[in-house]
Amino acid sequence: MAIQWPTWSAIAPTLVLGLTALLLFVVDSISPDSTNRGLLSGIATVGSLVALGITGWFLSAGTGNETITLYNGALVVDTMSLFFVLIFTSVTALVSVASYDYLRDHAYQAEYYALVVLAATGMTLMASANSLAVVFVSLELASLPSYALVAILKKNRGSVEAGLKYFLIGALSSAIFAYGISLVYGVTGSLRLPQVASALAGSGWESVSGVLGVGVLMVLGGFAFKTASVPFHFWAPEAYEGAPAPVSAFLSSASKAAGFALAFRVFVEGFPLGAAASAGIDWALLFQILAVATMVLGNFAAATQEKVKRMLAYSSIGHAGYVLIGLAALSAEASTNGDVMGAAMAHLLVYGFMNTGAFLFVAMAENWGVGRRF
């Protein structure tokens, strides 16, 4: 007889990551001055691998073939969310392993690993968010630990300065994003993406189409920050250069993929192109402009850099433009949208691992004494 698992078990990878972060905090509370990097790195790595294994099992068993809805529609688990969770957990495990030697004799190791796992927890929630409220909370859960991770090298002025700039730009983008959500809620009367889409499919939007358009534009700005897309890309070169190399790898791959997971979910499910166009909002055109600007600026700027981290940062911005093509190429006819989204997701998968490898090689060079040392 088949085992009937409870519905909440569909978010088991998220729960495992959350429990792993709590365990790291417990270890830190018992031994605040602990530098047992083997234990700390092992806990973070094992927790990430367990979450990765559960996600792979779900995908192989076809768990996401039929959408699973949890908590009254606030979260959904489907193939797309599991695909992105697979990326997040894989990158988290790689970063945790790479940090073992990189953080030798460095303080705040327990906090470092806990912040990495907490950020990954927020990213898994971002992939499953089906409500604008959950979208905002999960985005902040992923962003707040990232600010601290960038500035964790307290004795390094570049790290602290990069973390401060990242935080200030992130706070501004969060405020813009939250205000955009409030405008969308005020017009549609709902925060859940299916209800927002149903409201947009109705009629009588002429008097409030401007307010709704501004709200959608502000929401798009929040995603542009998270994915380091033009014109919200200014934080990326500073943050990637000042942060520890494993953190740069984490931000450039997992964090960027999380931003696109949210964008795919919100704009495809919450603001369907056909319904949005009938309300006078052509967000595909906005993504087309963003894609062109991001690709051009990112790649041309990368070609002029003399520092490896800044070059990789601008290259990461350029790759964000490539993925934006996936949103820019969507049409009101849904027959080809699946192929377009699949291509964008495949690019994120390959890019995520390749860019993680590039930054981890930089971490090895720094650890060997070629670059910065603690």
Residue positions per predicted region:
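Alpha-helical transmembrane segments of multi-pass membrane proteins predominantly involved
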Residues: 1-374
